[in-house]
């Protein structure tokens, strides 16, 4: 019933999906970017913390099904925060929310955490990397 997206790279995919399916498009944005009163959810990232917001006047019924689209799932914090904005403020059931990400970084555990929190998640591709090799290159560069 609704396509939602997380700022900003998710907009690229979600806008097209919403247009092609003729569905409303809801933006989850950084604080202060939306014109009306908002619901806010703070969360942790792999490198700090931040918040996202959704407008309070968004027309969402508790029975609506929502697809949340983003480009990447790493730790899962952003997607979970967005999903919780809908479950806590619009009384959307977790079973009515599907999180769709283009890329999954499974080594960081985000997709597993999303599933453990009770949300459905689908990804188009997984990108595995060897942390030991990554850190050896990183330390060599420094």
Label for each model-derived stretch:
Residues 1-7, 97:
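Short glycine-rich phosphate-binding loop at a beta-alpha junction
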Residues 5, 68-69:
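Generic enzyme active-site microenvironment
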Residues 10-14, 107-108:
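Short, well-ordered alpha-helical microsegments
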Residues 12-21, 83:
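Short Gly/Thr/Asp-enriched flexible loops that form oxyanion-binding sites at enzyme active sites
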Residues 22-67, 138-139:
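Short, glycine/charge-rich flexible loops or terminal/linker lids adjacent to PRPP-binding catalytic cores
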Residues 70-80:
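Acidic, divalent-metal-coordinating active-site segment for phosphoryl/phosphodiester hydrolysis
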Residues 81-142:
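PRPP-dependent phosphoribosyltransferase catalytic core
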């Amino acid at each position: 019933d609704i396509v939602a997206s997380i700022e900003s790279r998710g907009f690229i995919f979600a806008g097209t999906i919403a247009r092609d399916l003729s569905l409303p498009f809801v933006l989850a944005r950084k604080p202060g970017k939306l014109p009306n009163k908002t619901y806010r959810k703070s969360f942790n990232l792999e490198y700090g913390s931040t918040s996202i917001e959704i407008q309070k006047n968004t027309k969402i019924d508790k029975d609506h099904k929502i697809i949340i689209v983003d480009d990447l799932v790493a730790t899962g914090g952003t997607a979970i925060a967005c999903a919780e904005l809908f479950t806590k403020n619009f009384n959307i059931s977790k079973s009515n929310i599907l999180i769709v990400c283009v890329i999954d970084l499974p080594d960081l555990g985000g997709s597993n955490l999303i599933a453990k929190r009770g949300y459905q998640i689908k990804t188009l591709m997984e990108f595995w990397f060897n942390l030991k090799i990554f850190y050896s290159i990183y330390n060599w560069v420094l």
